């Protein structure tokens, strides 16, 4: 995986994570086959997750975020946590030519849409460890929903790296919107 692999030591160093014996045992085996890792080596990032919410990541690395504003009060930022497991998340994205529903319908049985906390965890780790941006200004839709402001339904959460503000920011993308989007994609394990 080369530069697209992060290990336990990277997570310990950059997040202050303590895995303990059970955590190390859980992460001892990478659940993806060698063939999958070879096929994904230029398009995905492999990393171990550690149980943190976006608000907890913000507390550890505030300079990397644009101000959270009201997002800190939404459940996607406050309650959702990264799982203690291996992740293989796509770092290259398909062109934004289809709607969320159209792209979601095309996911293979081995793919899923990750949560915003998982995307943020990966983006922060990539920046702190290698000074590499993952999203480069794109709005990447995640699996989380948040209550819309002007729209009565739930909206998809998007994550982006705001290059002007040098930080990670969030927003709402209405389910009523039919414009093309960039969908975050992860391999299931």
What annotation goes with each model-predicted range?
Residues 1-112, 118-189:
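A binding-site-centric feature that preferentially detects glycan-recognition modules on secreted/surface proteins
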């Amino acid at each position: 995986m080369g530069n697209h692999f992060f290990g336990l030591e990277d997570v310990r160093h950059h997040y202050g994570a303590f895995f303990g014996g059970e955590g190390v045992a859980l992460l001892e085996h990478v659940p993806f086959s060698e063939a999958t890792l070879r096929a994904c080596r230029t398009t995905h990032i492999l990393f171990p997750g550690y149980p943190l919410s976006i608000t907890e990541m913000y507390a550890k690395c505030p300079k990397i975020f644009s101000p959270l504003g009201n997002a800190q009060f939404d459940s996607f930022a406050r309650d959702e946590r990264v799982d203690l497991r291996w992740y293989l998340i796509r770092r290259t994205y398909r062109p934004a030519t289809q709607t969320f529903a159209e792209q979601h319908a095309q996911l293979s049985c081995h793919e899923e849409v990750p949560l915003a906390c998982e995307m943020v965890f990966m983006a922060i780790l990539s920046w702190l460890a290698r000074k590499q941006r993952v999203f480069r200004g794109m709005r990447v839709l995640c699996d989380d929903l948040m209550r819309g402001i002007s729209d009565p339904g739930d909206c998809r959460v998007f994550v982006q790296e705001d290059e002007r503000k040098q930080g990670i920011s969030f927003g709402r993308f209405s389910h009523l919107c039919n414009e093309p989007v960039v969908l975050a994609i992860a391999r299931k394990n």
